[in-house]
């Protein structure tokens, strides 16, 4: 039995581990909302403003580490969400942002609410693409999920025309399976040895801890390292997440953002160890 694009889209999202779609929809998203009449695996959480739903998706992705989905309405909806999309990009949040596009049959007339959505989103996304057919839909969603969840993680964007969501998939269309790229890396042994020598020779080292410590859930490791080295720890000045427990004895503060204040911190130390 063939399915419409709207149902295939939800099938693929479910298989990618998506649990919630945060959305502020409009007319171009009606096919997707119609699919939720029978959808019982995913929730659609409605927000009254694009800033709100984009922020919710960003927060969900950061808190769970899972792929979040934000559903917006055409060009105005994407435009209204850009500030929060910027935040998601800076935080490295794995969010799939989608926007309903006008039907492909009328896009040459540049109809109301139309714009080049993929180009609009591209500066703030790891990958941005407009789906041009029902046949492209599975591969586009699979690629978007893989890119968003591959380190360094971050938001991706898909523009999905309404007639792609309403089109019936050809018999036997392969919707694929989730794929992931392993993030395991090994540092260069020579460089590690050099760093170890610097640390062992330092008398007053200091540690600056960044967001990636939290993103990798490396709290125990950085605490153990700080205790072994005996170095105070500063978190980055405009952090998205806390990278070090503030109740720990070696926690100092956040990194000052102004040069004079930063200099006053650094002049007390002979080695800066930047982590994450």
Residue positions per predicted region:
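N-terminal alpha/beta PP-like core and its mobile active-site loop of ThDP/TPP-dependent enzymes
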Residues: 1-276
């Amino acid at each position: 039995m063939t399915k419409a694009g709207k149902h295939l889209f939800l099938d693929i999202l479910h298989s990618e581990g998506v649990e919630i779609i945060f959305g502020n929809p409009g007319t171009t998203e009606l096919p997707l909302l119609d699919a939720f009449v029978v959808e019982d695996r995913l929730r659609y959480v409605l927000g009254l403003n694009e800033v709100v739903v984009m922020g919710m998706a960003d927060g969900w992705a950061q808190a769970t580490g899972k792929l979040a989905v934000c559903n917006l309405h055409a060009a105005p909806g994407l435009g209204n969400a850009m500030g929060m999309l910027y935040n998601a990009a800076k935080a490295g949040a794995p969010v799939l942002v989608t926007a309903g596009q006008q039907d492909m049959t009328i896009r040459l007339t540049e109809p109301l609410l139309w714009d080049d959505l993929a180009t609009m989103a591209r500066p703030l996304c790891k990958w941005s693409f407009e789906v041009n057919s029902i046949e492209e839909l599975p591969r586009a969603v699979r690629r978007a999920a893989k890119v968003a969840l591959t380190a360094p993680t971050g938001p991706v964007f898909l523009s999905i025309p309404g007639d792609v969501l309403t089109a019936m998939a050809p018999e036997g269309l392969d919707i694929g399976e989730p794929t992931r790229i392993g993030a395991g890396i090994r540092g260069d042994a020579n460089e590690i040895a050099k760093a170890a020598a610097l640390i062992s020779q330092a008398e007053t080292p200091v540690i600056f801890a960044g967001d990636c410590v939290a993103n990798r859930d490396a709290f125990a490791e950085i605490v153990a390292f700080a205790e072994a080295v005996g170095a105070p720890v500063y978190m980055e000045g405009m952090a998205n997440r806390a990278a070090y427990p503030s109740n720990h004895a070696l926690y100092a503060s956040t990194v000052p953002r102004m040069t004079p204040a930063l200099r006053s911190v650094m002049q007390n130390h002979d080695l800066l160890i930047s982590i994450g």
